[in-house]
Structures are given as C-alpha cells and as structure tokens.
C-alpha cells in the first residue's frame, strides 16, 4: 500500500499495488510506503502487518487437460469435503475448565490455516499411492476455507488428494478431527455447476455413513 494515485485507489489517498519481492524492497524505501499485505508468505517486520492466507493451489490445468492426464478412462473428478461435527467440537470439545474464548479462537484460526495455507503444500507434495506418483497433484482448488474444500482435477489425482488430505488432517489434529468427502467422476465437458450439486449429495451421504 502506498500514498499515491497510481495503483488501485483506496480511501484516504492511498492505493494498492501488486509487486514481486524485488519490487517490494525498492518500494519500502519510498516515503509514501504504508504497509505490505503478503499472500501465503511469512513476512515479518515493521509495516509488514497483514498476512493473507489463500488456498489457491493449481497446476494450471483445464478440465480437458485433466481428463487426458488421468489414468485409464479420460475423466475428471470433483471433490467436496468438510470437517465432521466441527460445530460440536466448539460446543463440547473442551473440558469445562478449559473452554475459553481464546482457545476457541485459536481452534478457529488453526482450522482456517489448514484449509487456506497448509492445503497448498499438501497438494504440491502429494504422496505416492496406487493411483498417482508422488509430487504436485494435477488438480485445481476451486474453494478452500473454514473447514470446506472443493477441487477438480484428473480423476485418479483427486482420489489421491482425498487420501493425502485425510492423512494430513489426522496428523494436524492428532486424530481429534475427521473429514468426510464426496467424489464424483464426470466427462470433461460436464457442467461444473452440476458436478458440484451432485457431489454435494455424495458428501452428505458420506457424513451420514
């Protein structure tokens, strides 16, 4: 953020600029520099005040590309998932003497951090399985935040992602939280909005299982 009128205009005579690390170092020396907003970076220091976590992993594929990259049949898969009984965890997950606002706020922040930050690393460093080799997954996150996840990719890669995420959350929460997911396999041209609705029903069936 700078005090000028050359970027995206903000109230108070300030503007927002998108810059790489080298450009940022130069800008920080200017008199009009106000602060930095960093996306998925652990920048710290004076006027480095706001960290923005975004679950935005993608290998820049399209549905057509994902279908061609899949193993066997040329299909994509859509996954929708969320954490089981998270509301109940907030209500009854703490001992009475330890049920404080600060602990509940910390739990909320840590869940958000998993789905907005750690999820990118999980998908970028996928584990080897029968369905996929180790390495970056051939998927794209459509939405990830709170305790919800929606992604699309090559069908075998999406299933491998589900396994990776399940294991990662189990380790992250020391086995205290579990996640349910619905996965649907579709032709590449099938409307994504319809995929989302159909997979939402599968997700609910998984929760009821």
What are these regions (language model features)?
Residues 1-209:
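Regulatory/sensor and coupling segments of signal-transduction and defense proteins
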């Amino acid at each position: 953020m700078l005090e000028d009128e050359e970027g995206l205009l903000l109230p108070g005579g300030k503007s927002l600029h998108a810059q790489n690390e080298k450009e940022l170092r130069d800008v920080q020396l200017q008199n009009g520099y106000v602060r930095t907003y960093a996306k998925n970076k652990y920048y710290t220091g004076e006027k480095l005040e706001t960290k923005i976590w975004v679950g935005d992993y993608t290998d820049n594929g399209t549905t057509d590309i994902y279908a061609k990259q899949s193993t066997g049949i040329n299909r994509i898969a859509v996954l929708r998932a969320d954490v089981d009984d998270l509301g109940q965890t907030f209500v009854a997950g703490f001992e009475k003497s330890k049920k404080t606002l600060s602990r509940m706020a910390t739990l909320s922040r840590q869940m958000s951090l998993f789905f907005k930050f750690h999820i990118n690393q999980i998908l970028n460093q996928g584990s080897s399985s029968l369905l996929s080799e180790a390495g970056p997954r051939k998927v794209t996150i459509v939405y990830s935040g709170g305790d919800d996840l929606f992604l699309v990719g090559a069908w075998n890669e999406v299933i491998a992602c589900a396994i990776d995420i399940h294991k990662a959350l189990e380790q992250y929460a020391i086995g205290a939280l579990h996640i349910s997911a619905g996965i649907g396999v579709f032709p590449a041209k099938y409307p994504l909005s319809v995929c989302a609705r159909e997979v939402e029903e599968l997700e609910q069936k998984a929760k009821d299982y």
